[in-house]
Structure formats: structure tokens, C-alpha cells
């Protein structure tokens, strides 16, 4: 199933601006009839799922039950959010990221922590390898650039990479124009 993948924090709550923005992203994706895939838990994953489900599309949540029990040590709920209508259980974080990237038409990276950073880097590296091997179309990656700018801008300098490495990203401000044209 083709979908648009959204990565983001599990920590924001309903009523916070980050949550509301993520819900709007989900609504926008669903408005144009695209299915959505997230990590399936709370925070921005829940907000995106809620917005997309309200538009009647399939909302896949790729969970990792072996790592995330019903409650974590800190008391955060770790069940799929109630807006997921297609749970995919992955065996590991690596498998989870693989499922989320597989068949993805586009990737949206919202603010997050180390898990979101890992997902961003795997998606970024996948596009880099696709570009080198010229055997697959690049997956458009949309960032909330005001949040990710420092990492994205400095990383190629620190790793002595070609500045072309930065061309893999689009600003989330261009999202509606892009999503409206996807098949």
C-alpha cells in the first residue's frame, strides 16, 4: 500500500501547538486521498493519525510491541493510538523504519528527539544511496526546517560531504502543493 510517512515526537499532547500542527498535516494528507503511516503511538504520531483518519484514509501504525510495553518506565502509554486502523507489528526498530519507508511516496519529518533523528538519517541515507546507484527514484523528504535546520545544514560540513547532499529536502511550507500533485 502506498502511503506518506510521517516521523515525529511521541511526547507532545493535544492542545499544544506541535500537536495541532501535526493534526493539520494529517488532514492535508488525507484531504488529497493519501494513506498515512506513522510509528503508531502518541504525540505527533497520534495527531497525524487523527487528522488523516478524519479524512477517511487508511492510517497505518507500525508498532514494536517487543520494545514498547503497554506502559513504559515513565508511565507513558505505549499502545497504538486510537486513530490507527491498520496496525503493523514490527520485530525491531530497524524493521519499523524499513516498513515505514517501504512504498512511501513522501516522508515528512516533524520535530522530535533521538528516534525521529534516527528515522531522518535513515531516510536521508536511503536517498543518498538511491542517488548514487541511480536505481530508484528519490523519496521526497519534507522537514519543518526551522526545527531541523542546524543539523541539516551543518551535518554535510562536519562529514565532508558534497553540498548536493542538502538537495534531498523540501520545506514543509511547500507540502500542500506537492501532496496535491502526488498520484
Feature names for model-found ranges:
Residues 1-61:
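Glycine-rich beta-alpha loop segments
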Residues 13, 115-117, 132:
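Short glycine-rich, flexible loops that bind phosphorylated cofactors or substrates
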Residues 43-110:
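Acidic/glycine-enriched connector segments
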Residues 47-52, 118-131:
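Short Gly/Thr/Asp-enriched flexible loops that form oxyanion-binding sites at enzyme active sites
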Residues 61-65, 110, 124-151, 161-166:
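Short, acidic/small-residue loops that bind anionic groups at enzyme active sites
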Residues 99, 161-183:
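A charged, well-structured terminal subsegment
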Residues 101-125:
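A donor-sugar binding/catalytic signature common to diverse glycosyltransferases
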Amino acid at each position: 500500500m502506498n502511503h506518506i510517512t510521517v516521523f515525529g515526537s511521541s511526547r507532545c499532547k493535544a492542545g499544544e501547538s506541535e500537536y495541532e500542527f501535526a493534526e493539520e498535516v494529517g488532514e492535508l494528507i488525507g484531504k488529497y486521498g493519501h494513506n498515512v503511516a506513522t510509528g503508531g503511538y502518541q504525540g505527533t504520531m497520534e495527531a497525524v493519525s487523527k487528522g488523516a483518519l478524519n479524512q477517511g484514509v487508511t492510517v497505518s501504525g507500525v508498532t514494536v510491541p517487543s520494545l514498547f510495553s503497554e506502559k513504559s518506565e515513565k508511565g507513558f502509554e505505549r499502545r497504538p493510538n486510537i486513530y490507527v486502523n491498520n496496525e503493523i507489528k514490527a520485530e525491531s526498530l530497524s524493521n519499523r523504519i524499513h516498513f515505514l519507508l517501504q512504498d512511501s511516496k513522501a516522508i515528512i519529518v516533524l520535530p522530535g528527539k533521538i528516534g525521529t533523528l534516527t528515522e531522518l538519517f535513515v531516510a536521508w541515507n536511503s536517498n543518498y544511496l538511491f542517488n548514487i546507484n541511480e536505481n530508484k527514484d528519490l523519496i521526497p523528504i519534507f522537514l519543518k526546517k526551522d526545527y531541523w535546520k542546524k543539523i541539516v545544514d551543518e551535518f554535510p560540513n562536519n562529514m565532508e560531504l558534497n553540498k548536493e547532499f542538502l538537495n534531498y529536502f523540501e520545506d514543509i511550507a511547500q507540502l500542500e502543493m506537492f501532496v496535491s500533485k502526488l498520484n
